Regions:
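Short gly/ser-rich loop at a beta-strand->alpha-helix junction or flexible surface loop bordering the NTP-binding
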Residues: 1-66
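Hydrophobic alpha-helical interaction segments
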Residues: 64-148
Length: 148
């Protein structure tokens, strides 16, 4: 079977590449956070498109930027940075999928990006999934912040 590059639909600041797809596209420094581009950027279905995200109602436009990507092919798109991509996953994935993000900070992010992710998610109130993620991924900080 032939493998095809997934179609990248028209993006905007409110409909952008994020999640696993963004984690597999190199950032401005040519780094990738994840290492499964074939899974998320290619398909045996020649008409399959990349999923676009929109959580701007919760997180605004922080971490979303218009830039040129070189992979899977060169084009200008709106794309989330790695911390925002993980925050979008936490907000949009099904509860049973959340464990796939366990240890994502040490697996995917540097120290500054880890702090960005924490700040994104800490700003979200009354969301049990976000609380559960913060409890697991940022245990000490989560409980220290609860004391304040």
């Amino acid at each position: 079977m032939e493998l095809y590059e997934r179609i990248i639909p028209k993006t905007s600041s409110t409909s952008y590449i994020s999640g696993w797809e963004a984690l597999n596209i190199p950032d401005e420094n040519r780094n990738t956070a994840d290492w499964h581009p074939r899974t998320y950027l290619f398909s045996y279905d020649k008409d399959k498109a990349i999923n676009l995200y929109n959580t701007t109602n919760v997180l605004g436009n922080s971490g979303i930027k218009k830039r040129t990507i070189d992979y899977p092919s060169k084009r200008e798109v709106y794309i989330a940075n790695f911390p925002r991509a993980i925050a979008d996953l936490v907000l949009t994935m099904k509860d049973y999928q959340l464990p796939s993000l366990h240890n994502c900070c040490s697996d995917f992010l540097n120290e500054d990006e880890t702090e960005q992710l924490y700040q994104y998610l800490r700003s979200i109130k009354d969301n049990p999934r976000v609380d559960e993620f913060l409890k697991y991924e940022f245990t000490v900080r989560y409980f220290n912040d609860k004391k304040l």
